[in-house]
């Protein structure tokens, strides 16, 4: 069982990266699967999808499913469905297959520097991301966008994780940083300064 992110790095040597690279599917996951997601990218250059699949099961799941399909499979859908039919549906605003209009990209955010960022997102759960630091499973972060989040961890733990990322030189290499939710700190109203 690799749930909770505690043991996921123990299976990395046993994954068949050549086979993963050859399959025409994307690996989807989030948080607890951070180690595996980043290892797959480092070893195959195949960009995984950082997405909490559980969203497809909860409240607003119908909308989440539609947004997920539009975002991840729009190209495949356009190839499968008669293009004239797709154009007609889009023209009549019945179904928009453009990724830019996907609800997956509609969330509140705030820029602290600059006004836009575009690129490949790496990272995920900060603790799980750091478990692969210094290994062959840690990808080149140059010009990537770093996503960091955590469910657990008090302020001291999170500060330590950020310090380690800084000491690895990651912050100087990435072109952007997404700070996600740090759930335990948020619930206790703790703030990083």
Predicted regions and their residues:
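N-terminal small/polar loop signature for handling phosphorylated ligands or for N-terminal nucleophile
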Residues: 1-23
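Conserved anion/nucleotide-ligand pocket segment
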Residues: 47-127
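Structural motif
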Residues: 1, 28, 145-149, 178
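Short, acidic/small-residue loops that bind anionic groups at enzyme active sites
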Residues: 15-40, 47-54
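Short glycine-rich anion-binding loops that position phosphate/pyrophosphate groups of nucleotides
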Residues: 4-6, 153, 182-183
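Oxyanion-binding "anion nests"
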Residues: 120-158
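C-terminal active-site/capping subdomain that shapes the small-molecule cofactor and substrate pocket
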Residues: 157-193
């Amino acid at each position: 069982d690799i749930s909770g992110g505690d043991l996921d790095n123990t299976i990395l040597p046993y994954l068949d990266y050549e086979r993963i690279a050859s399959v025409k599917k994307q690996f989807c996951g989030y948080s607890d699967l951070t180690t595996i997601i980043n290892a797959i990218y480092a070893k195959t250059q195949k960009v995984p999808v950082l997405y909490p699949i559980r969203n497809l099961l909860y409240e607003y799941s119908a909308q989440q499913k539609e947004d997920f399909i539009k975002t991840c499979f729009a190209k495949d859908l356009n190839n499968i469905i008669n293009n004239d039919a797709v154009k007609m549906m889009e023209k009549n605003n019945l179904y928009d297959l453009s990724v830019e209009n996907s609800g997956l990209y509609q969330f509140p955010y705030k820029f602290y520097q600059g006004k836009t960022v575009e690129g490949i997102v790496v990272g995920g759960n900060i603790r799980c991301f750091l478990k692969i630091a210094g290994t062959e499973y840690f990808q080149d972060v140059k010009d990537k966008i770093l996503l960091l989040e955590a469910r657990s961890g008090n302020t001291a733990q999170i500060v330590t994780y950020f310090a380690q990322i800084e000491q690895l030189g990651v912050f100087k290499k990435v072109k952007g940083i997404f700070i996600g939710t740090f759930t335990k700190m948020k619930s206790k109203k703790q703030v990083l300064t």
